[in-house]
A protein has these predicted regions:
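Post-signal peptide N-terminal segment of mature Sec-exported envelope proteins
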Residues: 26-48
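Positively charged n-region of N-terminal signal peptides that target proteins for export
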Residues: 1-4
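C-terminal/domain-edge helix-coil "capping" segments
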Residues: 17-34, 138-224
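Envelope-exposed proteins and targeting segments
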Residues: 34-37, 67, 105-110, 124-131, ...
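Extracytoplasmic/secreted cell-surface and envelope-processing proteins
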Residues: 119-123
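N-terminal segment of the mature soluble domain
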Residues: 47-111, 141, 178
Length: 224
């Protein structure tokens, strides 16, 4: 019996290893084109929370910079997008992106689709469902695509026992959830989802992360 259990565990381990895919295999066009600069497109908001678009737009800059890319500041490009009627990214998500290459010099454009945005004061969480699509301004090809449903845990545990302790935790959680900045929550979501994105020229692992594991195309997780 013990022999069969060991064999089953080995088979399971081999199966899990076989299913793991590298970043080169998952995102081959990222390594082919090697984009250096990214223009962040205004998010496409599919939720009832109207402000989600503006909040989330400002969260994309830092995480992409940390991945080693030159990113055009959303604050700088916003006026240009509005003047060129590009603030509604829906009309560009499948369109020709060469104008952004010609005007800005951007190698790629990052599109985001906000599919859900929910705050739970009692449970203590901010949950965002976002799809990320990076398209080449040169070829129009999708270079990177990933979607995540990420909950930012804002719960507070005082350590006090009994009914009083539970009430204190509930009250503290509600306050902490309300006080958690939406920009902070959005940035944490982006950092987590883009964690397997191949690094750009200014990253320490540029052109060296091909063999690192890529994540699943859709992820669901809770972060602190």
């Amino acid at each position: 019996m013990k022999k069969y259990i060991i064999l089953a565990m080995v088979a399971l381990l081999m199966s899990s290893c076989a299913e793991q895919i590298t970043r080169l295999a998952q995102y081959p066009k990222m390594y082919e084109e090697k984009p250096l600069s990214i223009a962040v497109m205004p998010p496409i908001n599919q939720t009832n929370f109207v402000e989600a678009k503006d909040y989330f737009y400002t969260t994309l800059y830092a995480p992409l910079c940390e991945k080693g890319y030159y990113v055009y500041s959303p604050m700088m490009t916003m006026e240009m997008f509005q003047a060129e009627s590009a603030y509604d990214a829906e009309q560009f998500i499948e369109a020709d992106l060469s104008p952004f290459r010609n005007v800005l010099g951007a190698d790629a454009a990052m599109f985001t689709i906000i599919k859900s945005w929910k705050r739970s004061k009692i449970g203590g969480s901010l949950t965002a469902g976002v799809e990320y699509i990076l398209r080449s301004t040169k070829t129009g090809e999708t270079l990177y695509h990933r979607e995540g449903l990420i909950s930012v845990d804002t719960s507070v545990h005082s350590g006090a026992g009994g009914l009083f302790g539970a009430l204190v935790d509930i009250a503290a959680t509600a306050i902490n959830t309300a006080a958690t900045d939406k920009v902070v929550a959005g940035r944490k979501c982006t950092l987590f989802v883009l964690s397997d994105m191949p690094e750009g020229k200014y990253g320490t692992k540029f052109d060296k992360d091909q063999t690192l594991p890529a994540g699943k195309s859709y992820i669901k997780a809770t972060v602190k």
